[in-house]
Amino acid sequence: MKIEKLIPLPKDKVRFKLSSFKSVPKEAGCYVLATFENDILYIGLSNNLFTRFQQHLDNPEKINPTKEGKAIWFYFTIYDSKNLPKLERTWINQFDAIHGRHSILNKINSPVS
C-alpha cells in the first residue's frame, strides 16, 4: 500500500537517516516508515517522535532491507497524545483491508482504549 492512500495523510516527511533527526519534532504523533517508492513498511505511534526516530535507527530490523524494500522515508503527523492509538489503528486497519495482513514490520496489534 502506498502512503498516499492513508486517510488522513501524514503531514510531514524526512529521510530515514541519522542526518535528519533534528528535523523530527519532540512531540506526540503517528508515523510511517516507507520505501523510496512510498510503500508502507511500518506504522507506529509515539509520545516523542524525535526519540522514536532515533530508536528505530538503532534497530537493525528497521534499517535493513526487507523483502518489500528498505525504509527510506519517515512520514509523520503531530497528533493529540490521547488520540494516538485511534489514528494508528485507523492506518493499520486501512493497510490490513487492502493486504489482509499487517505491514511487514508491524508484528502485533496496537491496543485501542
Language-model regions: role of each:
Residues 59, 93-98:
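A structural signal for alpha-helix termini and helix-coil/disorder junctions
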Residues 70, 110-113:
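Alpha-helix boundary/capping detector
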Residues 97-109:
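Coupling/hinge elements of helicase-like and P-loop NTPase modules
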